[in-house]
Design a protein with these regions (language model features):
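Short, well-ordered amphipathic alpha-helical segments that serve as non-catalytic structural scaffolds
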Residues: 15-18, 60-68
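Short Gly/Pro-enriched turn/cap motifs at secondary-structure boundaries
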Residues: 25-27
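C-terminal binding/interaction regions
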Residues: 2-22, 73-142
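Compact, glycine-rich, soluble single-domain proteins
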Residues: 48-60
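Short beta-strand scaffold segments in enzyme catalytic cores
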Residues: 29-37
Length: 142
């Protein structure tokens, strides 16, 4: 059961879908959009940005997180992630391992929600703990 209302879920999904238009993915043609909801209600967006060197690529989720953190925001409730080959979405796209690790840095794994969607009507919601059950985070270094 989500802590978000249906209208907010749909808003995040539609925003993430729209962010795919800004994706720079000339090598994979796998376009990803993200919409990150901060605890203060602000939505930070991101898209994936590829590079011929591959290593310097950045995922949509990290783009959204880094955008928020660069503006002083470090508390979050949820993120919506959508992705697939150029064109209409046909399947769910989950965050990669690096993005899950970034989420562990800033989010409570028991309450932070990850929405993976195909359309505003077809989506799944998981907690970070469900998606990354043995995640390593700041508490492990305390």
């Amino acid at each position: 059961m989500s802590n978000l209302n249906e209208a907010k879920i749909k808003e995040l999904i539609e925003t993430a879908i729209g962010m795919r238009n800004y994706s720079y993915a000339p090598y994979s043609n796998f376009k990803v959009g993200a919409a990150l909801l901060a605890k203060n209600g602000t939505v930070y967006t991101g898209c994936n940005v590829e590079n011929a060197g591959y290593t310097p690529c950045n995922c949509a989720e990290r783009t959204a997180f880094f955008k928020a953190v660069s503006e002083g925001v470090k508390e979050f409730d949820a993120i919506c992630v959508v992705g697939g080959k150029e064109g209409p979405l046909t399947d769910f796209a989950a965050p990669c391992g690096v993005c899950r690790q970034v989420m562990m840095e800033f989010c409570d794994p028991d309450t932070f929600e990850i929405i993976v969607a195909i359309t505003p009507e077809e989506y799944k919601i998981l907690t970070l703990k469900e998606l990354f059950p043995m995640g390593f985070g700041p508490a492990d270094l305390a």
